Amino acid sequence: MNIYFDESRNTGEIGINGDKLNYFGQRYFVLVGYIEDKSITQSYMSFKDKWNKFVNNGAEMDEIKGTDLLTRKNNSALEEFISTFIKGNNIYVTIYDKKFFLVSQFLNWFFMGLGDYDFNMYHKFLLFLMKVDDYFLTRYINLTKNNSMENVREFVSYIKLHKFAECVTSPFEAVIAVEISQLVEGLEKRGEFTEYLYDTISENVRIKKSDRNNIVNLTALGETILMMKHNIKDLSNNEIVVFHDEIEVVQDYIKHYWKNTMIDFVKSKRTLEVQLADNIASIYGNLISKVLPLNTENDLPKLLSDDYSWIRKTIQKVFNYIDNNNIKLVISMREAALVKAYISKKDFKSLHEFNYDVLKRLESRFQTELSNHLSIDETKKLFDR
């Protein structure tokens, strides 16, 4: 089985730019895998022949870019693309919030694999900590880049003193802040806490004369392949051949961890299948960035406005035309509930009705996540199959 991958939204390493995280307005990384189907690839070639010059303003280009399909002028081409290619069971989509990536990584590291031994507490803390500011996360990233016992001790002290004021907007959240502080104190009393953190922090990989880590591409690729293996029973690694668009540094990072995996990095200009994956990734990335992030309830009204009617209709199509088991949302449960409500066919008559639907979905989302949760050992077993 050949599967072709490409991505969208500012790929690469999550790092620091000044006093901010470097993803700016491209927080949601999208990876798309296309399982090769000769007839679909042939259809895409015909689509390119038909629309290439029109989309590219009269020029014959090597590729049609997904971002160009989203312009008003190219709406007819976009409609044909969605109805022809974003459907069926051979497309896999992973949407990964880069902030979620950092917060969940921090949470599992600092609280010693919390997601495996207390799923309820893990998601309560995760939803709470998604509100932390960039300064908190830059402190964490700096530690991953400069790991030492002294720096770990300083970071633990910082966590103990941190009041998480930016996360507290209700009495319930004030209690969570206290619970985090108490848990840190309890872990310290068990002994060797600092040593554990020093030994288990995210490692750096030396690539092109720089230390690299926190590259979301690798994790998203692994999540997507796990999703595919979960859906296609008995699919083994020996049956999968991965083709991925060439990306400097990222491909070296992936190769470092996947030494024995069949993965070939190819030029998109020469590979129709990668171009198809690129177009789909660009469409998802552009649309999801219009809907998320959900920072406060004040972000909801715009989603129901007339200005967003085209966005809602289009995002409903791209999410509902393919098998939902082939789409993985690695975002907060709150935002996942919002997306599920937004792509539904419900005609919300008021903001209250929309918000109520989001809250109902949030309540059920926890049970969904719990039923889908795999421990580290279970994940490794599936990945190695």
Where are these regions (language model features)?
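Charge-dense, low-complexity intrinsically disordered regions
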Residues: 89-385
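An N-terminal structural lobe/cap that precedes and organizes the functional/catalytic core
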Residues: 1-94
